[in-house]
Curated annotation (Swiss-Prot):
GO molecular-function term, one example from the UniProt record: glutamyl-tRNA reductase activity
Catalysed reactions, semicolon-separated: (S)-4-amino-5-oxopentanoate + tRNA(Glu) + NADP(+) = L-glutamyl-tRNA(Glu) + NADPH + H(+)
A Pfam short name: GlutR_N
Keywords for the protein's UniProt record, in alphabetical order: NADP, Oxidoreductase, Porphyrin biosynthesis
Name of the gene encoding the protein in the UniProt record: hemA
The keyword Oxidoreductase is assigned to this record: yes
Quaternary structure note: Homodimer.
Species this protein is from: Bordetella pertussis (strain Tohama I / ATCC BAA-589 / NCTC 13251)
Site residues by UniProt (Important for activity): H101
A single BP term in Gene Ontology: protoporphyrinogen IX biosynthetic process from glutamate
Positions with a binding annotation for NADP(+): G191, A192, G193, E194, M195, I196
Similarity-based family: Belongs to the glutamyl-tRNA reductase family.
Protein known as: Glutamyl-tRNA reductase
NCBIfam families from the UniProt entry: hemA (TIGR01035)
Record-listed E.C. numbers: 1.2.1.70
Amino acid sequence: MSVAVLAFGLNHTSAPVSVRERVSMPVDLVKPALEGLRATFGGAVREAAILSTCNRTELYCAAEGQVAEHLPAWLAEHNRLEAAALRPHLYRHQHDDAVRHAFRVASGLDSMVLGEPQILGQMKDAVRAANEAGALGTLLHQLFQRTFSVAKEVRSQTAIGAHSVSMAATAVRLAERVFGQLEDARTLFIGAGEMIELCATHFAAQRPRSMVVANRTIERAETLAGRFSAQTMKLADLTERLAEFDVIVSCTASSLPILGLGMVERATRQRRHRPMVMIDLAVPRDIEPEVGRLDDVYLYSVDDLGRLVQSGTDARRAAVVQAEAIIETRVQGFMHWMQSREVVPVIRDLHQAADDVRAAELERARRMLARGESPEAVLEQLAHGLTQKYLHGPLAALNRSEGDERRQLLAWVPRLFPGRDSRR
């Protein structure tokens, strides 16, 4: 059965964070998930990769056609969810649509922040994880290599990433809405990954009163804090120290909330109801959503920031048209490569058949020479034998055919045997 490229999953436009966090896969769970996927479908899934970020969880597969119908059930079962509840949020792309989707994702056209560059690195990490899991083959390897090339071309030839309003910059603006200038604000960053580093960079530019980094691994917190002359603290100290901070930005890989309603409620009482801005960029969420109901807390999720970011994308809309044109050209190029792969086995078989004929006729010629026959007669017989053997198949097909089939075969003769006019 033929193998098709398939892209399947959900993202920030198809599913709210409450759904995305339930199918999000930390890096250490990607390999077991790929193994489970291939074990479930056996040889029907030839190759696979999983891209899981705050804004999307997607599967890219080289698979037989019937696999697509069963992927929603697999994803639901893998995450212990009801398929009926998950299905409305899922999308599926096949063939050139799947290739187009991969190119758009890597180029930042499908991102919550139009043109944001982080997604390309995240996709490269996903490909690396799939390769380490032994789940990549020729087709997906070629797809992703072309995907990275297209993303680079789009960014170098268009203004898609120019003046990008980042999530980190938006987080600063939200804090400024509540506190005005941030010179007196005490800021806490929970986590030490790329997003926290970006946020810390933007907040540091506003010269807040203090910056503290809390992380499960204190060494990573110290490395990040050292860049901004910030302090560090242990996650275990959050309960006692949370009330100190005016702005909290959190983005960890925790599968469970770090800040619960009770903890934050106690902190607001200790602060005598001075406001707190809490920005949760994690998926799954680090802060229980019920915290947003507290009068003195301004809680923003990654989806809230995404909606605010969209207002800053108008200046880049013109670049989208140019980017889409580049992508469309490259999609057609990839599909041509895929189609050319289909004839490779046929070409290989033709070469083998021709080589078998050559070897047989050559051996016959050697025997004739060994019997003392003249070289001229041997060459004549060799040429005649090769001609007869090579033409036997086409001539037999023509003789057996009739009607439309014969007309089609006759039309192909000049293309298969160029240099001679067809005589009918």
